């Protein structure tokens, strides 16, 4: 049954969880919810409530705050109240006054000054408000009275009118005094705010270093008795009145509510689960504590647990919070500290969670002197490890865990001279209790004796293992306990088999396994080991057929049509293997002329042998700086030359580059441990000879081996470890105890579980329970090896790792300076190019300002070795221009006049000036009186009468190379997207293929991806996590390496006097062995300061300019930059011949780069720019952070300054301050700090205030800015934009053809072909969805806006034509018609579009069937084209005519 309005209000009170003192307000008993209006588009809910009387102000604000907080995840809220009140209460009226004014939406300093000074009062039946003069009275009546009265009405007040009353005693002087006082107060408040921010930041920094506030632990509310029981978070599953929890803060947010109060939102965990904790501030004291609370702190919280009905989650509403200390893991060992020599960071792909910095910091706290990094297959943590080691004073051991492979596995063991065809063979197979020849035993031994391909005898015996078989063994082998119980003993069966084999050639599939068990049994029973030749059919198949995906016995017998039943029963396997052997030997003779046993190993290690070899883990540790370079080469080879499913490293490659590298035996996946586990001491001893040190790990790390029954029990595991220690002693090689760390603390294990779970069943780690592999302390490791005795444990855990670390040099993995390539004569060429062009433009005798600027720049560029960087860029730009593609510059390169003179950029950074192309007269404007040379009035040369060129944008060189000109130049160039691959490949011509690489990137798990992993883990493990716990688990799973990639534009250039391995290993992006370019293995940011990176970007603007030029024949460089028709676009639509209503935009800039978005069009509507320099301002304002909104916008709207005067681009700051007389160096430094959002130091602020030319608003504006755009970048972009806009105004069909061809990727051809009505209907359909519109629909809406404008300007868009349409570009059919390309058809990709055109060029399509077959067009696309009358002339099927038959 529906609740009545009063009951609804009571339900609402429960949901928003008001504090008890407010919830019991008597007036709430009769409160009603009259209506809730849901505004879907704006995501706002309006609550219409009714009460008997107006609520006390404190009650209202508390109610509003909790209502906002309760609905924060759903929508914004607003409240409208009606009451039965007939009379006004003066006290209540006054209490609400400031709130009503602040929420009126009226942005007027006059009103807010009035609010601060006066309050309305009741006199008789009137409500009066004292004002000072007629100006204020008129303002209040015209602009504020109605709005404020309506504001009171919405809060439940009865109707009334506020009458302004002039205070006759107030003189003009008092007004001026008041304003002066207010100005002082404002300045004081601004200063106080700045100081508060500084104090807050200082407090945070202090907390980071000290861990607690200056005056002790934080306490909010009442203290919490230490004896009060603390609930484990996972135990709380329903609402409770009062509980205490204790947890670690992993996320924090402070929200400022409309009332001005603050809401603290903490996310806390005790690692059993997590909770969201909320608390409202009561006063300024609470707010200061809110600021002091930070992530990483531990708190006890007492409060109530309540269900958030909308979020459907339990949250804690805190009453009391107390900061507490939390016990941390310690390393209390006194007899030396351990060194971890096997450790994985978050660069071990999807397998470890913590960055190396976390481990190094912990090692430092524990007093551990060194730490190794040994990620799987990669070295990508090295740069961060180096930085962390320097910061924390910990020595870094640089290593990697690789997949080591033998250079081919023998096909035959125990070679002898024996003709294959005439040999007698015994093909044997064993079934065993497990995989270890040492700890398991044979339970069935079967064989067949064969001559000439026929079975002549057989052998099949069970062996009693003298212990019950496990369920796993029975499942795998089909052998039961009943079958082996009471069978012959091992000694008897093996003696019989030895006699059966005689002198025959033995064979088997994966025979090394069977040989291992057979020889182990022979050894136990004093029988001679096998010395017969033993052929492995697995390796013989791999040698003959490396192309096969697998070489399993069942796969091969099917391929060779050999019947195989009861696979994994020894007798069936042996016979099948025998027949397979004869077929393979026949192929070996035919293909490779192998006819003798001695020949079968001749091709071992030939070809792509590494693909067939079984990898084993090994750790490679750089011992010297030369060893590090060898390590770089080895890892590069494993990722490029020997990659197969994973990077692999042949032993021969390691042997060739082993100098300066120590090789460790690694984990249970290493060959030494595996040999000990499966084949015994002697085999492990033999394998260990290859290694420099032997690793053993805690039994907990080997736990999966027990679970998978690879090791029988704990005693067997201890025996393996003891025997590995004996191997080390026997070979005089150190044995070290390592932890195989994959995360920092035990509680972090869940993150690794989630990551590995996300990989699915393909990841072998998902097949058993994950071991405990946290970063262990010395104490933990000594305890883990206490079964060896204290002395030996100390040796393995502490002494031996220290000995190895002492053998390793202090190694530097990244360079400490920039190494640029050398080009012979680069300095002279740059000087010549620069001066030749300067003289060409400015005459034989350069103007002083030009000469001084060039001298200054060339000295910096040549002196710091940057000439080659400029010359490379010049050659790239020159070639692109020669090939017909303009290049746009990005960033600050346009700040360099040398870049302008050498043709790298079109942007001229000199002050605005006139320049005569005939007699070289020039006139410069150096005092900031003109914003851009393009804004100068047209003028003829006073010397010769030639129309003067206009140029110069007043951009300081310092913004590019720093104040001292020694900052490495970062030249970013925008090439056409079509031309970008050509430009990239041209670098190979310039420097050689082995000296250029793509800049590598590392893709890590992002927030949304991690969230998906957590939800999948929650679902698959049938658990339920609170929202806060999902957030914690997702946060812990982010940042882990997921893949690698390449920077879309970055080309790394290696100088010819070095090689790439001096800087970084190399690889293919995302391990794609077919990729066209190799990339740096290190993320390019890690080596950015050491090696030159060219940014050769692909951009749509140059592509569009090229297409416009091709279609029109107009040279884009000839287009004027001050065309009135083009400039009119930025203040209206008249130059397009349409009204704003027709195109749904007041500005004509739809589709104009930089100016087409709704945000920028809104800026244009407010500012109406008319000059190039004002467009520069718009560009800077729109790209900056906190430069327009809440800053320049307010200054313009309040009339403080106009658009041309506000701070737009970063360079403006330096030049403005210099023009105002401030020191050049300080001006530069202020600009640098402001553009990075770092504020301005107090002494610099004072210097600005002391300069009478610097306005106060300018300083305040600087203090708000977080990021600023470079003026050179804005200039280059606007140049391109104006050229494109020129075609939009004067050549519309060419413009729309180019726009749709180059910039648009989402189309609705049906709507576009229907004309204006169809497009407008589709636009409305999308806009009506509001926030629910998909990204694809939002992108489509942008294209539809342009299509609508195109149609309104009289241009028709036609559906595709099967005979005429292009694959990708729109075509101009006549002056008013565009024909769509095939790629504009939904779901018709580029490849199919090209195939249609290619097939059409061969011959016309005869039918829809023909189109489908030759054009590769799907049935769905055929239906689309048919429905839209594209295929009207085509029959469904090919029709055979009489003439076709003749």
From Swiss-Prot:
Pfam families, alphabetized: DNA_pol3_a_NI (PF14480), DNA_pol3_a_NII (PF11490), DNA_pol3_alpha (PF07733), DNA_pol3_finger (PF17657), HHH_6 (PF14579), PHP (PF02811), RNase_T (PF00929), tRNA_anti-codon (PF01336)
Localization, UniProt: Cytoplasm
Chief subcellular location: cytoplasm
Catalysed reactions listed for this entry: DNA(n) + a 2'-deoxyribonucleoside 5'-triphosphate = DNA(n+1) + diphosphate
EC number: 2.7.7.7
Keywords from the named record: Cytoplasm, DNA replication, DNA-directed DNA polymerase, Exonuclease, Hydrolase, Nuclease, Nucleotidyltransferase, Transferase
Keyword Heme attached: no
All residue ranges annotated as the Exonuclease domain in the record: 425-581
MF annotations from Gene Ontology: 3'-5' exonuclease activity; DNA binding; DNA-directed DNA polymerase activity
UniProt key word Magnesium: no
Assigned GO CC terms: cytoplasm
InterPro entries in the record: DNA_pol3_alpha_NTPase_dom, DNA_pol3_finger, DNA_PolC-like_N_II, DNA_PolC-type_N_I, DnaE2/DnaE/PolC, DNAPol_HHH, DnaQ, Exonuclease_RNaseT/DNA_pol3
Gene Ontology BP annotations: DNA-templated DNA replication
Similarity comment: family membership: Belongs to the DNA polymerase type-C family. PolC subfamily.
HAMAP family (alphabetical): DNApol_PolC
Function: Required for replicative DNA synthesis. This DNA polymerase also exhibits 3' to 5' exonuclease activity.
Protein name, UniProt field: DNA polymerase III PolC-type
Originating gene: polC
